[in-house]
């Protein structure tokens, strides 16, 4: 009698359980594979870590059997675990191996070799990825080293239809990349965003398959769809809001290659999509697939084992000059900056914005470093990016900078702002969520960082917006409050995770004037 069915695919495997004992054993095995979040506990009056989202999928099939979809890296550990605890053998397992089954249709996607030439390290990485027998890889290059270019070349070599799965804020960027790298794809790609567009794609799959070779999907659109199918029980599922189950969706379009950019940003969503979509080849891109949280590192290794990550073996050469500017605020600890879950930059900025006298001094400080590190060194076309945590602070700084530099183009890039704001402005005020990851700003020479944060990923990504410009010292000026304990702690964390990035690492103290050493509250 069969106790389970095991279906092995390129990126994942699917287990259907016919034995009740194996259901409990499987749940025990998967108990560590969750993401966590912090919630405030009223009883103990502090934030505690609680389970958030699983890095696996579980539902009931039509015969009420438990089905689990797990990442490929867990195959051997899982079989070993249930073998030791569930007394299974080859006679009790129904095995289906899909890793040799070809899902993708041919597509003549041509890379523009006349316009783009791969560097030596890009050629080496491309060769390693294309020769990887597991057909599942991550390009883990530092920012500015051409992940998108390398990925576009690799995908063109596969000669199959492509799914590009990205956050909605990167849709425009990847449209540009497709047109730039694939000159023969001008009328052969489509962007799918929103439930109506996705349903139409499912209903008219054959028509779309004939017309397009590259499908660019919004992650949020796909997750709204997949979440419906996570609940395969009762009347809710029978309504079938989407006519095709996610495990059958990609094959209907003849897609053979899967690409995801900035994979570190929503690993839970990327994980779930990988557990459903069946392709012949998978490629993930990120510069910072690391964390200062050990549990997150463990989940990353489960999602993409280190042997499948391809990057440089030599140092990339540091080129960023970092200025660490310590300033002081009168009675700084009295400013609101703490929540139940710890430090909040949002509250800190709101505290400054609510005090006009303090805000004017803060503005003066920001203007000093924009003037020194950008204006005085500026050449035509060079750009400056100012980071703040809140939209309100970004808009305020935009007004201040426009008044100070009326001849320059100064804008925000937040929320609904057009992508061209970021590309064409001389000075842009933006948030980490809008301009911290996944955007390449031509001739960005200076960043003024007003945010204090300890995240390894966020700090490296924001600093990495600065690309190397021959003959120019790119400058990253980071401000932090020297008499606010949390700011000092976060500075030390930033130093730990970014000092290796810097060509120079300098320290200085800001003084409002010759006779004062701190910003006054009033």
Language-model region placement:
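N-terminal pre-P-loop "Q-motif" helix
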Residues: 114-135
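Post-DEXD/H (motif II) to motif III coupling segment of the RecA-like Helicase ATP-binding lobe
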Residues: 253-257, 262-324
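Conserved helicase motor "Helicase C" RecA-like lobe of SF1/SF2 P-loop NTPases
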Residues: 387-414
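Conserved RecA-like P-loop NTPase helicase motor core
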Residues: 411-500
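Conserved helix-turn-beta segment of the N-terminal RecA-like "Helicase ATP-binding" lobe
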Residues: 170-198, 404-408
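Conserved Walker A/P-loop ATP-binding site and its immediately adjacent core
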Residues: 143, 148-153, 157-183, 389-394
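Conserved interdomain linker/interface between the two RecA-like ATPase lobes of SF2 helicase motors
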Residues: 309-384
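Conserved two-lobed SF2 helicase motor
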Residues: 209-231, 238, 423-437
């Amino acid at each position: 009698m069969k106790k389970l069915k095991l279906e092995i695919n390129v990126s994942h495997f699917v287990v259907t359980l016919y034995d009740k004992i194996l259901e409990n054993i499987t749940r025990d095995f998967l108990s560590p594979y969750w993401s966590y979040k912090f919630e405030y506990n009223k009883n103990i009056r502090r934030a505690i870590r609680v389970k958030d989202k699983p890095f696996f999928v579980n539902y009931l099939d039509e015969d009420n059997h438990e089905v689990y979809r797990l990442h490929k890296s867990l195959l051997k550990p899982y079989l070993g675990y249930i073998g030791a605890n569930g007394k299974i053998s080859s006679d009790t397992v129904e095995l289906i191996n899909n890793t040799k089954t070809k899902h993708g249709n041919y597509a003549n996607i041509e890379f523009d070799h006349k316009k783009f030439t791969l560097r030596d390290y890009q050629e080496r990485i491309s060769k390693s990825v294309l020769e990887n027998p597991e057909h599942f890889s991550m390009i883990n290059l530092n920012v500015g080293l051409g992940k998108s270019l390398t990925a576009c070349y690799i995908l063109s070599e596969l000669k199959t239809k492509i799914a590009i799965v990205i956050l909605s804020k990167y849709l425009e960027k990847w449209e540009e990349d497709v047109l730039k790298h694939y000159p023969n794809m001008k009328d052969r790609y489509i962007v799918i965003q929103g439930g109506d567009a996705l349903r139409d794609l499912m209903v008219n799959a054959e028509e779309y398959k004939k017309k397009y070779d590259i499908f660019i999907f919004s992650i949020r659109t796909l997750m709204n769809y997949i979440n419906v199918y996570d609940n395969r029980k009762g009347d809710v599922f029978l309504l079938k809001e989407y006519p095709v189950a996610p495990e059958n969706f990609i094959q209907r379009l003849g897609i053979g290659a899967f690409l995801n950019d900035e994979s570190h940003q929503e690993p839970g969503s990327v994980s779930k999509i990988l557990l459903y979509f069946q392709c012949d080849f998978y490629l993930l891109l990120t510069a910072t697939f690391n964390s200062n949280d050990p549990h997150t590192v463990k989940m990353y290794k489960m999602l993409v084992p280190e042997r499948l990550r391809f990057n440089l073996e030599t140092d990339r050469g540091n080129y960023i000059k970092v200025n660490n500017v310590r300033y002081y605020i009168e009675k700084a600890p009295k400013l609101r900056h703490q929540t139940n879950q710890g430090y909040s930059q949002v509250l800190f900025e709101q505290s400054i914005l609510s005090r006009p006298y303090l805000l004017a001094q803060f503005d003066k400080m920001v203007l000093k470093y924009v003037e020194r590190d950008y204006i005085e060194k500026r050449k035509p076309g060079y750009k400056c990016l100012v980071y703040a945590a809140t939209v309100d602070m970004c808009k305020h700084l935009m007004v201040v900078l426009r008044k100070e530099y009326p001849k320059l183009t100064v804008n925000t890039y937040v929320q609904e702002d057009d992508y061209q704001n970021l590309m064409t402005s001389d000075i842009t005020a933006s948030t980490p969520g809008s301009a911290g990851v996944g955007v390449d700003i031509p001739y960005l020479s200076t960043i003024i960082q007003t945010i204090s944060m300890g995240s390894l990923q966020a700090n490296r990504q924001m600093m990495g917006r600065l690309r190397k410009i021959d003959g120019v010292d790119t400058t990253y000026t980071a401000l932090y409050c020297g008499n606010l304990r949390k700011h000092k702690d976060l500075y030390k964390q930033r130093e730990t995770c970014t000092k290796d990035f810097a060509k120079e690492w300098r320290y200085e103290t800001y003084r409002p004037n010759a006779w004062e050493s701190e910003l006054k509250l009033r």
